[in-house]
Amino acid sequence: MNVRMNHASSTTHMRFIALVAACLLAGCGGGESPGDGGVDGDGSTPVWVGVIGTGQSLSVGAASNGLVFTTPWPGSYKLALGARETTWPIDATDPELSLVAVAEPIRTINTTSYSAPYPINIYGETFHSAMAAQLDTINRAAAGAGGGVGGVGLTSVHSVVGQGDSSITVIRKGGTGNAYAASLFEASALTRLVAAAGARYEVFAVMLTHGEKDAELPSYEDDIARLQADYEQDLQAITGQTRAIPLILTQQHAEPVTGRSTSTVGAWKAGVDHPGKIYCAGPKYQYAYAGDRIHLLAGQYDRLGVKYAEVAHEIVVRGNDWQPLQPIGITVEGQTIAVRFHVPVPPLAWDEAFGAPHQFVHAAWKNGRGFEIEDSQGEVTITGATIDGDTIRLGIDRLPDTTTAPLMVRYAMTQDATQLAGGLVSGRFGQLHDSDPLIGADAREIDCMMTSGSTQATAAAGAFFGRAAHDMVEVVGGSGLPPDTTVVAMGANIASLSQPWTGPTGPARLRFRSNQWNYAVAFEMAAP
């Protein structure tokens, strides 16, 4: 079976790539005040790119337990509502509205309701400030890397309109909530305000962080496609832009507690079936979750923002046909099932830091490293999983039986736990990843005390705020930790590492950064 690969999008999209490259070469972004930015086709008007974030609670920072990106990022913006911050509807021409540098919180944090509509919809650290920082940083770093963007910044303008605990039937066009209407309001207001600042506002991408509420909604993929098409049509009418507006999303893995999630598969398939329009940026099972095991910690929202920025930059600015680590074909030869993958950054590898799923429940798959196989007889025992270039070869203990049901290959789709288990190996989890070396704008150097032979790093109280399990750790300007050392547990002032310290006992400066490897999407496919 083959999965269709995404291909280059429309001519207007390619024209915009050339436009952005030209704008950046001319000195786009990175300014301290409105007026800095890119240029349009006539070489005179700066272009500021809009990012619209919609979804449910993970799109608005629920359970982040604090704020990290609180310092305004120069050259990237959000809409300030002034005296209108708690009212709706709002007139896009209201003089209370203004542009301010993006920082967390996006607006005043709501502490009284878990599912409030825009503009009182913010619950903590969103991914947007980290995304803005990463877009600017990655653009500056792209000089000489084939991106044609010349080492200058990228001005982004962020809108956060999602509503916690809400189905796509709430946030879509004509939905029962106001998220979609708020998107159009912000786009209208920003078009006016950015023009007054001497630039032009165009929507760069819509980011959809969603799916838990609709975990068992059969129409989810079609609903995503409709949302993208509606956004593109309505936003183009407001901004006057002609290029496509991609929708970029990630998969959810927490819901349902029992059974399998149609929204998880739908989020991946939407990118496969709607090339150039929808892009799945990958899964989130590899993230560190809050104590409720459905939301993320503050630093992990930032990790998500870095990944969103990387994917959006590859698609829109560099014009690359970015795809996640996803299956593109399955073949069966006797008792071996070969799953071939598109690999963003080879080589493939296994994440050994947190163990393998299905060690107690669904034990037939305990050697599958996240892979799951079923046929007419039920669960098929996996005897081993081996990396062979871009292919995973799965050994099974008998020939497949397809007399009454197809041979199904799944990955990170079934959990062992009987409660919410986001980020745990007892939840929906997998170990396969690529080798993306990206160091995000959320990286931070921390002075630690190390003990030779110990896996513990100790720092001053509060120094580890915003860091979490799954972070990568390196020694700054020295040695003492092997490559790919990972934080396996994080306390208030103690980080437990996956590898022991090999240097002498004493102080060391360590760099903690989010893990930006691309992990394999959760999927299910019928083998031929």
Predicted regions and their residues:
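Autoprocessing Asn-cyclization modules and mimics
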Residues: 339, 440-504
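Bacterial N-terminal signal peptides that target proteins for export
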Residues: 2-17
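Hydrophobic helical h-region of N-terminal Sec-dependent signal peptides
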Residues: 19-23
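Bacterial signal peptide processing site
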Residues: 29-32
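Cell-envelope and extracellular/periplasmic
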Residues: 38-448, 492-494, 500-528
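Intrinsically disordered, low-complexity regions enriched in serine, threonine, proline
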Residues: 1, 12, 506-510
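C-terminal motif of bacterial Sec signal peptides marking the signal peptidase cleavage site
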Residues: 25-27
